[in-house]
Amino acid sequence: DTWVDKTLPLGDLRKRVEGSGWLYFECDGHDYSSIKETLAHAKTESQRPVFIYAHTKKGSGVSFMERFDSNGKFYKFHSGSPSDQDYMSAVNELVKKLGFSHELNWSQSIAFKNGIDVESDDLTPKTRNQSLIQIWAGILEELFESDKSLIALDADLSYDTGTYKVADKFSAQYIQCGIAEQDMVSMAGTLALSGKIPFVHSFASFLTTRAAEQIFNNLSENSKVIYCGFLAGVLPSAPGHSHQAVSDFGIVSSFPNIEIFEPACETEMSLMKSLVYESDKSIYLRVGSVDLPEKVDPKMVQLGRITQRKFGEKYAIITSGPSMAKIALEVARAESENEIAVFTYPTPKRHFN
């Protein structure tokens, strides 16, 4: 999302590499001649391992993709897919540089044999109409405003996990850990034992697998940490299978001394404001990135209880999270009006325990 020196400064990279016994080379990663020449030099070394540092610029070759945002802090084209318009502008700029005179113009479309319609989704967490990430950013801001013992830790995903407001307004309570979930979780455990309440932020697929051992160690020491796992579940699928968290619930459920909280909407998410203080356990906040079902009356939402979303007299569907809540409501409304009831339960592990 941002500059390397703001996430995990490299220091004197040459000294670090050569100090480990490696041969160090640098080259221009956008210059094929420079790359070819460097590789030729590297091949002459037969005794030591070789480290090549290729200097590159993200979005190089496309004028508007080489720039950061207006405040120079975040890179726009890291989080979310480019819009069709931006994509075509980038393609045509590259085509022109290659010496072609004609412009390309097409729209993205995918056709399935079963007739399912698929639309491209270029919305980011900050531009989606209603997003749990936006809501979480506001909740964090509210909590941090009144409590200096709270610390936000971020794995270079401030836009995708909602820590951007805390980073701007409460920088003394914000730690940018870079893409290093194991270190981040261990750091959080130490902060918790010193009397702080740390909020750890990353994608669910990375947080619960890479740092599973560190999470378990923290729990075994009764240190209270709020683990915030985003992009949970199969949808949205655009980031690919590596970013889809389908085992996180099972992994965290096997741990002791931890609550699981999976809100389905803004109203349920607001319960985190009280759960952070009421629970004496660590909390795993499981957040999906799909559009949300409609809000419910705050009077219908209470910690440790199911939330009724639709009345029904014959059957009941009980689920958690926004994705399944939307599907359950669609299924229930496809039947007779009062036949199927729909409930969401944001604290499912309490039931299993």
Question: At which residue positions do the language-model features occur?
Answer:
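Thiamine diphosphate
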Residues: 26, 100-286, 291-292, 300-303, ...
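Glycine-rich ThDP/TPP pyrophosphate-binding loop and its adjacent helix/strand module
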Residues: 1-101, 258-353
